[in-house]
Design a protein with these regions (language model features):
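Short acidic-aromatic active-site loops that bind/stabilize oxyanions
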Residues: 3-7, 28-36, 159-166
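Conserved S-adenosyl-L-methionine
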Residues: 28-132, 137-141, 146
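Long recognition/docking surfaces used for binding and targeting
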Residues: 1-22, 31
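Mobile active-site "lid"/loop adjacent to the S-adenosyl-L-methionine
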Residues: 75, 136-167
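Short, mixed-charge, low-aromatic patches
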Residues: 1-2, 125-129, 163
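N-terminal functional modules and adjacent low-complexity/disordered segments of proteins
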Residues: 16, 91, 150-151
Length: 167
């Protein structure tokens, strides 16, 4: 059967097992992957069809895979239209993201690192699309290491801008 597989069959199989992993193993560690229906909604609303697409909490790269499907549905090739950049805190998820892109025939620059503390891609002001479902359940954020302290977008004349945090 696998010798006669066509199209994105391996990608679909990988997504199936990734979803099973997300529903069991990942949640035990307090990590949750964004539901596919939400990912599809985000992609359909912002229509990321060109340039740099960045996900600062990319998990298993589901946003990128759905973006690839979106671009292909327009009759275009994702590799010719977009460049994916992702950052993921957990080492295992970083590996899952890279593998997910590979089995779907996509390429991207995925780095391991905590976005709260460091911007591995240095894309401030450069990304055409930023898609994320940030990890609201993050524990132990070290304020002293927070990248925000060095981010010129939130510092004004040596004083931090007052921010409103009303999710």
């Amino acid at each position: 059967v696998l010798q006669k597989a066509e199209g994105d069959l391996f990608g679909k199989i990988y997504e199936y097992f990734l979803n099973k992993f997300a529903m069991t193993g990942a949640q035990e560690g307090g990590e949750f992957f964004t539901p596919m229906s939400l990912v599809q909604t985000i992609v359909n609303v912002i229509e990321p069809d060109h340039g740099i697409v960045f996900d600062p909490a990319c998990g298993s790269a589901g946003m990128f895979v759905q973006t690839g499907y979106f671009i292909e549905s327009e009759g275009l090739k994702p590799a010719e239209k977009v460049t994916f950049y992702g950052q993921e805190k957990a080492e295992l998820n970083t590996k899952l993201a890279k593998m997910n892109l590979t089995v779907h025939g996509l390429e991207g620059k995925i780095f391991e690192g905590n976005t709260f503390y460091e911007d591995k891609h240095n894309l401030v002001g450069s990304a055409d699309f930023v898609m994320a479902n940030p990890p609201f359940n993050v524990d132990g954020v070290d304020k002293a290491k927070d990248v925000e302290k060095k981010d010129t977008r939130v510092i004004l004349d040596g004083k931090e801008k007052k921010k409103k945090n009303d999710n």
